[in-house]
Amino acid sequence: MQTVRMTTAQALVKFLNQQYVEFDGKQQKFIKGIFTIFGHGNVVGLGQALEEDAGELEVYQGRNEQGMANAAMAFAKQKHRKQIMACTSSVGPGSANMITSAATASANNIPVLLLPGDVFATRQPDPVLQQIEQTHDLSISTNDAFRAVSKYWDRINRPEQLMTAMIQAMRVLTNPADTGAVTICLPQDVQGEAWDFPSYFFQKRVHRIERRLPTKASLADAVEMIKRKKKPVMICGGGVRYAEAAEELKQFAETFHIPFGETQAGKSAIESSHPYNLGGIGVTGNIAANTIAKEADLVIGIGTRFTDFTTASKQLFQNEEVEFVNINISEFHANKLDALKVIADAKEALLTLIDELQVIDYRSSYTVEIADAKEAWETELSRLHNIRFTGQDFTPEVEGHFDGNLNEYVDALGSQLTQTAVIGQINTLLDEDAIIVGAAGSLPGDLQRMWASRKPNTYHMEYGYSCMGYEVAGALGAKIAEPSKEVYAMVGDGSYQMLHSELVTSLQENKKINVLLFDNSGFGCINNLQMGNGMGSFGTEFRYRNQETRKLDGAIMKIDFAASAAGYGVKTYHVTSLEQLREALIDAKKQTVSTLIDIKVLPKTMTNGYESWWHVGVAEVSKSQSVQAAYESKVSNLQQARSY
């Protein structure tokens, strides 16, 4: 048996270079590169291996471990899970910073390979710098926290353990049914230890992502259920995009006259103008999709996890005879809502169902309902685009909260811009193939409802974990995945302040991204939630501490985000009017460096809900009558919702 003497880290790098995936006959390198932040826990081990021979891996320098791992996840998401990035950090706080990103990737079923440094396997220098000592178990380190948020976790305590660990890692990373974060912990001493690795460990490996076919029995059951139903609706989930099944879904909708709503992950699989595309569905959905869904007697979920935002906490589907067919590669997700399960690749399942339903000449009984619903939403969308602040007589979309003191925000922000009007203009002015990236705050709701996707795969929303601070890093990852397209991070001031470190990396790599920063001086989405459930405004506006009340109810904070970003070398713009916004967007397209447009918008001018409800933990007992009323409303809504 031929062997090669290498360190554990060197063997890991060589192995990663030999991994390929094949999908529909197309073969490509699986691991494009590796994001790094070096510290004592990885620099002389994995760092040395990368310096000596990185192979074809592109080595990127991150600025924050969570940021770079978010970028890695966004890259894989934009690549539809067919190519990924790895990330390496030092021990302790460096590795802990990636835990949030691991959770984000696993919640979204997006593959990312995390390689955190770890404490010494020998324990000789214990406690090493940045080590946590647990007196009840000395084998525990910070990296054990990854267990809860990883789809596969391992620790390499001996060099030869690397082989089985990495084979299992690749199994999970290339498994569409159960992929997510894979964490391989690398004790810093073991990284540098040498071993005689068998040459066959480094052979080229092609991981074929196969399309699972539906069984005849599940297919027959699905056909039997569908043919009994008159008003079905489909839900286009992220699985449609990852399985590249958009054309088949369109064919299914057109052939059988069945409309579909979109989840955050599924949006832009098919252009918004398609006659059967109702748009966003659920809590952050629009009036068209939610109206049709309420009356549907069959819900066909395609590649969706049926989150509470999709089902409106299982209260959306109000037809007493409603049943569910779930087409999903994952048996776990297919099993939800007591559905009839079709465990299969979305494309293969749809193609087979098309053949079977054509035999019986099936067609839904919709007449004008689909067109009427879409027309109603287009009318509402036009209204949202044209909302303008008019002074004291102005009623914001989210009314009854700040109605009396919006002028205070007008003065503080120096702007009368409404968020819905801003989004409308941005949607009009961006290139058709531009990619928008979002994750948290009020923007995901506005974008799922309002954004018209004119080209496929241009809407990139991380809403499986709704990770605050994902947006800027996510834009960088999407730009690395699609360097020829303009990429825009759609981010609020709250999320931007949490994390925007990889804006600097975008400059370093000459990967131009555009940050569209909506500043309403607060955590506006959560302020809506608390006040909508009977509370006052508490801890969600960005105000100075009042020296008299000792509370955060002083003057509104004024932050010049453009000036801050300009210090990095970003091209920046201040926007307080639609004309300034138009000029900034046009000029930003001409730039070769990353840009940031600081857009001051009034709070409460985002969209509000449409025919949906969201279950949150309202206080059962309170001195506040408004909180008591909110609790009673919750109880009433729960009576209309499924129990599971």
Curated annotation (Swiss-Prot):
Region (Thiamine pyrophosphate binding): 442-522
Chemical reaction(s) catalysed: 3D-3,5/4-trihydroxycyclohexane-1,2-dione + H2O = 5-deoxy-D-glucuronate + H(+)
Keyword vocabulary terms for this entry: Hydrolase, Magnesium, Metal-binding, NAD, Thiamine pyrophosphate
Pfam family, one: TPP_enzyme_M
Annotated binding of Mg(2+), by residue: 493, 520
EC number: 3.7.1.22
GO CC, any one term: acetolactate synthase complex
CDD domains (UniProt xref): TPP_IolD, TPP_PYR_POX_like
UniProt binding sites for thiamine diphosphate: 65
Entry keyword Metal-binding: yes
GO molecular function: 3D-(3,5/4)-trihydroxycyclohexane-1,2-dione hydrolase activity; acetolactate synthase activity; flavin adenine dinucleotide binding; magnesium ion binding; thiamine pyrophosphate binding
Keyword Heme included in the entry's annotation: no
Class of this enzyme: hydrolase
GO biological process: inositol catabolic process; isoleucine biosynthetic process; L-valine biosynthetic process
InterPro entries: DHS-like_NAD/FAD-binding_dom, Myo_inos_IolD, THcHDO_hydrolase_firmi, THDP-binding, Thiamin_PyroP_enz_cen_dom, Thiamin_PyroP_enz_TPP-bd_dom, TPP-bd_CS, TPP_enz
Annotated pathway: Polyol metabolism; myo-inositol degradation into acetyl-CoA; acetyl-CoA from myo-inositol: step 3/7
Cofactor binding notes: Binds 1 Mg(2+) ion per subunit. Binds 1 thiamine pyrophosphate per subunit.
Domain of life: Bacteria
Function in brief: Involved in the cleavage of the C1-C2 bond of 3D-(3,5/4)-trihydroxycyclohexane-1,2-dione (THcHDO) to yield 5-deoxy-glucuronate (5DG).
Family: Belongs to the TPP enzyme family.
HAMAP family attached to this UniProt entry: IolD
Protein name, as recorded: 3D-(3,5/4)-trihydroxycyclohexane-1,2-dione hydrolase 1
Source lineage: Bacteria, Bacillati, Bacillota, Bacilli, Bacillales
Gene field: iolD1
